[in-house]
Amino acid sequence: MDFHLSKEHLLVRKMYREFAETEVKPLAEELDEEERFPMETVEKMGKLGMMGIYFPTEVGGAGGDVLSYVMAVEELSKVCGTTGVIVSAHTSLCAAPIYENGTPEQKAKYLPKLCSGEWLGAFGLTEPGAGTDAQGQQTFAKQDPETGDWILNGSKIFITNAGYANVFIVIAVTDIVPDKKGRPTKQCSAFIVERTDPGFSVGKAEDK
């Protein structure tokens, strides 16, 4: 097996490295000191195709591969951990679930905006009393029998990109059933929640 990068991947890495050095690194210290979210950098990365690297062009992506995506996150994280995590949470935890599991209508609605950087994505699992233990979470979802809409009730914490995200993948309990030993087990589902949905709000940023 050849572990050397292809010429194409070397060129891609060079492009990401130059972007990281010129556009991201100069802001890194300022972002940490001021606890500021680099929305201007997100917009630039969107124009460069970095917010949807390995998604096909048919859904608005750059048409690259996973290795190119990994190299992008690596180069960004070398100079600014904040920016690397912004891209990885947006891509792996929000855009990817929609691409892999969404309906054709959901893909058409969300992926072009996510891949272009017009919209930012986030993922909500962690809770105040449960951490990232899905079985311990207290966010529940119930379906309205008349409208068919799902109503979510609960709170999440430590959600990367939450302050600026337009769309969230939120994990909620939809049923409780016995396991093989008769113990109650929570069944969880992933929901697409938009920032503008009724009843949704984002709390103050944590002092980190």
What role is predicted for each listed range?
Residues 117-125:
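A short, Trp-centered hydrophobic/proline-enriched beta-strand micro-motif
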Residues 149-203:
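A short core secondary-structure module
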Residues 133-153:
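Cytochrome P450 C-terminal beta-domain/meander region
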Residues 85-105, 131-134, 143:
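N-terminal glycine-rich flavin-associated loop
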Residues 136-138, 198-208:
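Flexible, small-/acidic-enriched active-site or ligand-binding loops
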Residues 49, 103, 154:
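Conserved G/P- and acidic residue-centered "switch" motifs that form tight phosphate/ATP-binding loops
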